[in-house]
Amino acid sequence: MLFPSIIAGLKHRGIRMAKKEKIEFPKIEWRDFSPAPIIGVDEVGRGCLAGPVYAAAVIFKSDALNDLVTDSKLLSEKRREELADLILKEHIVGIGSASVEEIDEINILNASLLAMKRAVEKLGVKSGHVLVDGNKKIPNLKGFEQSTIVKGDLRVAPISAASIVAKVTRDRLMKDLGVKYPHYGFEIHKGYSTPVHKQSIVDHGPCIAHRRSFAGVKEYV
């Protein structure tokens, strides 16, 4: 790390510090994939200490929301709720999940892929091209072509739509768990590893909604 005095000296001598380059992820024309239908898939909740992992799969029936959706993490809660309702109304959506018990049994990566598989199966279609956010294809998904797209939730509208639906659906569940287990604040942090959440585990121990294989939880089982 350069001290401020050194940086100031370099600037005085006309030496410019290189700026950290921002990596751009261009939009992808998802309609160019085949065969139809094109299915966007994403999951939410992988990094949480509590609650299931959720996934959604979306087939666009029109371009009505193509330019409105983006990664769910970049939207306000109110806007996510509005868009999720529109997506569910206007498009074909499948929602899947993997339980806390499944996460602890098969690990979070495999549970996330299982949730995505279940979401695709809920669509009621037997073939198509699945665009998966990330770099892992969905195992044992028969009858479908698959492509993985890094940062797909920013680059592919159906994946963005899936991320929105998955997050809103999971957030609603975590709010319900917050009522059922009031010591943990699930309705606020949605199960993520915040200082308040971690301290509540120290103070009260894990509840049935916690992932007992995760660091930050297993130490208090």
Curated annotation (Swiss-Prot):
Keywords: Cytoplasm, Endonuclease, Hydrolase, Manganese, Metal-binding, Nuclease. The keyword Phosphoprotein does not apply. Manganese or magnesium. Binds 1 divalent metal ion per monomer in the absence of substrate. May bind a second metal ion after substrate binding. A divalent metal cation binds at D42, E43, D133. Its cofactor is Mn(2+); Mg(2+). The keyword Manganese applies. Residues 36-221 form the RNase H type-2 domain. GO terms for molecular function: manganese ion binding; RNA binding; RNA-DNA hybrid ribonuclease activity. Endonuclease that specifically degrades the RNA of RNA-DNA hybrids. Belongs to the RNase HII family. This is Ribonuclease HII. It comes from Bdellovibrio bacteriovorus (strain ATCC 15356 / DSM 50701 / NCIMB 9529 / HD100). The gene is rnhB.
